[in-house]
């Protein structure tokens, strides 16, 4: 039973548990500040293999993450649509969205980013959702017997996030410019696969991150155009009632999405 009352105490418990699990001979020096404790916890959680955890660990982790996540929640009903009443562009932290599903830009190993404290969306979503997501993703890969293909989509629970579900998709990685037609089509396929999966699960709304524009190096302007065009076409052709949020983090992406919708309205 989870009896630790402060998130600092919970962090210390989780850090100690992961350190013992590693059979590491290094002496563990526990930081004094909450911020430093969080960074140490996050780094250990990021590199931890997809191995089972104890019920006690899960109870402590869930109590901490759910408490931290509920302190910063953005409700879809507070967002203003950019087109009609079902398409939104919103700048902020996608892990704060109270919504049916958020989209995670995954890699083909499909286990979440395993680089300690890396600031990619894959890392942040897995960190804030909890270890269960990595375990679920590992089971998906085990069952299909291969890495995840580009342009496909899989769904897991959101666990400790405000979002009910996470839809994971692997975008194309750009190694040379200009972007090939194949990679343009693969990016569009990512959006289509996520939309279809959301409708198959009778979800009401989904929020997309900017797929492939980070370390996968897809040019932001092209990616925004493809995202907007693909989503609008899907909603029109299928008569889907999905509400779709384009989540952006940078000012540049915000401007690019606004420009894409302005061109669409001309």
UniProtKB/Swiss-Prot annotation:
The keyword Zinc is assigned to this record: yes
Molecular function as annotated in GO: hydrolase activity, acting on glycosyl bonds
Family annotation (SUPFAM superfamilies): Macro domain-like
Catalytic activity, EC: 3.2.1.-
Signal peptide: none
Bound cofactor: record note: Binds 1 Zn(2+) ion per subunit.
SMART domains assigned: A1pp (SM00506)
Keyword field contains Hydrolase: yes
Stored NCBIfam families: PRK04143.1
Known function: ADP-ribosylhydrolase that specifically reverses the SirTM-mediated mono-ADP-ribosylation at an asparatate residue of GcvH-L, by releasing ADP-ribose from the target protein. May play a role in the regulation of the response to host-induced oxidative stress.
Protein name (database record): Protein-ADP-ribose hydrolase
Source organism of this protein record: Staphylococcus aureus (strain MSSA476)
